[in-house]
Amino acid sequence: HADYERQDKSGTKAFGGGVFAINGAWFPAPLDYKTDLFTTALEFNGKKGQARLEYINSDFNNDNLSVTWDNPFATGFGDEVSRSALEPDNKFQQLSLAGAYRFTSRFRFSGKAYVGKIKQDVPFLPYSISPEYEDRELPRQSLDGKLETSMYNLSGRFYLVLADRLDMTAAYKADKRDNKTPVDEYYPVIMEVWPAGPRSNRPYEYDRDQWKVDLRWRPTYTTRLMGGFKRETLKRTYQEVRKSDEDTWWGEFQFTPWHWFDTRLKYEYLDRDNSVYETQGNYDRAENPLMRKFNMADRQRNRGTVEVDLFPVDNLGVNVSYYITDDDYDESIIGLTKAKETSINLDVNYAISEAAVVYGFYTRDKIKSELSGSSSPANTMIWDGFTKDKIRT
């Protein structure tokens, strides 16, 4: 089959732009988008297997590629007018193949793979709208941005003969983002009037591999035991950590004594280990070499979850859950060192009729964090900070 869809969006949106005298200002910017989405697919369904081949093409066009505004706080040094680029035209294509096949009653295999490409080559704006810097030479006419993506997700499920009512799922997933955007030096002009030193663009890319094994055992009709192991390896470019390995061990107990009552207890332990931390710097603003970004720092996480589902009557469902997460960044000297989060959730849905459902929920989160910082380049004055956040929804 084949589908075509066009999305038109017009009007105004909030836009934040910097001006000379203050850090920024909000004002309405024009909005006029058009997205053309074309999808075609071939499907096969057999007694033992299914397959689907799909192609997607998306074209995004913006009739307003820039916005210009007057500076109400002009100082008379060429900052009377400012300009900024808006969302650029771009094109996305993706080809995917998904399928599943049942070899025997004990073994089933499924998988999905896709390759994609994103391209953006809208001409650059000048560094500044000011006549003094408007002709400052750019390294090239456009970004010539090219991004290639690929993903392979393979999984198989089969029953082991090691014990009765025991089954296992093994899965592997590879996800890659290959950024082919050229790297060049740029000489930006800050706030239209301040020429800055050279800086290069950073075409970020990553390569993620994930594999996992899950076991499920049902010793009785009302009881189920589950557990598993997962390893994820993430490789990055132009970032402080080039490689991260995270191992996850988990176990879960499920008890369903009645059809209207179901409870689950789950425990997870995650251990993230990184390669050598290499400070990238922020051009003319150096970073503390002891500082660690929390998403790239070594971390040990313990997480526990309790969840209960109740169905006292046919048209009423109640879910109550509680989880606690304890994070320890024991290798971080500057940055986030500890974090603890707890959450209580209540979800209720009531079906008035086949066409009407009433739904409500309540969530209370508590987050406690410990951070360390430094007030001197030599790190002789290290301070500690503590934060507490409460969020109710």
Can you name each region flagged by the protein language model?
Residues H1-T393:
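Gram-negative and organellar
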